[in-house]
């Protein structure tokens, strides 16, 4: 799974996911399913934001890569992918500037057009179940929730999907492609089932002679990938800003 993640996702997303896991004391080489899930979630958040701007009349517009957007404001502020302290700094700054209420939990994005925080979810389960879990945890009408699944389903607060249909279709297509690529490499079942992931992890580590002292609580697998899945296009300037938001000590 680790090799698949490194070949499937944009290198900057992989780097941010590694830093995020290390920030919480997690090892992406062992907890590979979580590594894949974090990369997927980050990519969806960035795809949600990419190409969306606000013009001088306050209208939301879409600008494709290569078109001039120097004088336009990004519609979405990306919070996901920053280290925790920086993320809360951004949230506090937005709250002070806009007057919106401060969320209890870190959101993933802020929508300057609708003046609301957004929590993005990507689930391997039923979308309505995952949506209810998120809603019960957040318990705030000020944070908008938008859930995507790997099967093309989605669910959002008050059925308000924020983005146009084409933008959402890009995200759904990407998630479906990731699922298909995982399945073709025999990785999907363990990605969905913690029990299967735990069994596969033990098997893989044993074959590498790394099973000594392994905590059986770990529920993620490591596997090998030989082919490459095309990484998505990324807004490099915004990604560079996110990379810079992590303290240098996390590089160790």
Curated annotation (Swiss-Prot):
Keyword Hydrolase: no
Pfam families in alphabetical order: Flu_PA (PF00603)
Localization, UniProt: Host cytoplasm; Host nucleus
Keywords, ordered alphabetically: Decay of host mRNAs by virus, Eukaryotic host gene expression shutoff by virus, Host cytoplasm, Host gene expression shutoff by virus, Host mRNA suppression by virus, Host nucleus, Host-virus interaction
GO function terms (MF aspect): RNA binding
Keyword check for Transcription: no
Chain positions of site Important for efficient shutoff activity and nuclear localization: 195, 198-199
Domain of life: Viruses
GO biological process: viral RNA genome replication; viral translational frameshifting
Active-site residues from the entry: 80, 108
Site (Important for efficient shutoff activity): 202-203, 206
Family: Belongs to the influenza viruses PA-X family.
Domain comment, as recorded: The probable endonuclease active site in the N-terminus and the basic amino acid cluster in the C-terminus are important for the shutoff activity. The C-terminus acts as a nuclear localization signal. The C-terminus is recruited to host protein complexes involved in nuclear Pol II RNA processing.
Function field: Plays a major role in the shutoff of the host protein expression by cleaving mRNAs probably via an endonuclease activity. This host shutoff allows the virus to escape from the host antiviral response. Hijacks host RNA splicing machinery to selectively target host RNAs containing introns for destruction. This may explain the preferential degradation of RNAs that have undergone co- or post-transcriptional processing.
Protein name: Protein PA-X
Gene encoding the protein: PA
């Amino acid at each position: 799974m680790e090799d698949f993640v490194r070949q499937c996702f944009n290198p900057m997303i992989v780097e941010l996911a590694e830093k995020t896991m290390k920030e919480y004391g997690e090892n992406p080489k062992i907890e590979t399913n979580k590594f894949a899930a974090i990369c997927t979630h980050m990519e969806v958040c960035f795809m949600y934001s990419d190409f969306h701007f606000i013009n001088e009349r306050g209208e939301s517009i879409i600008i494709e890569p290569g078109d001039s957007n120097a004088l336009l404001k990004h519609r979405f502020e990306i919070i996901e992918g920053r280290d925790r302290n920086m993320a809360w700094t951004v949230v506090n700054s937005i709250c002070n500037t806009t007057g919106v209420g401060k969320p209890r939990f870190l959101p993933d994005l802020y929508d300057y057009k609708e003046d609301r925080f957004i929590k993005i979810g990507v689930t391997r389960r039923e979308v309505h179940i995952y949506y209810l879990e998120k809603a019960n945890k957040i318990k705030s009408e000020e944070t908008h929730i938008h859930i995507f699944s790997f099967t093309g389903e989605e669910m959002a607060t008050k059925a308000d999907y924020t983005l146009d249909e084409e933008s959402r279709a890009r995200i759904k297509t990407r998630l479906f492609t990731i699922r298909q690529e995982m399945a073709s490499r025999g990785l999907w079942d363990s990605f969905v089932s913690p029990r299967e992931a735990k069994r596969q992890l033990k098997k893989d580590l044993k074959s590498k002679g790394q099973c000594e002292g392994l905590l059986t609580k770990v529920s993620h697998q490591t596997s090998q990938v030989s082919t490459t899945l095309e990484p998505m296009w990324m807004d490099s300037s915004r990604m560079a800003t996110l990379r810079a938001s992590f303290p240098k000590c996390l590089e160790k």
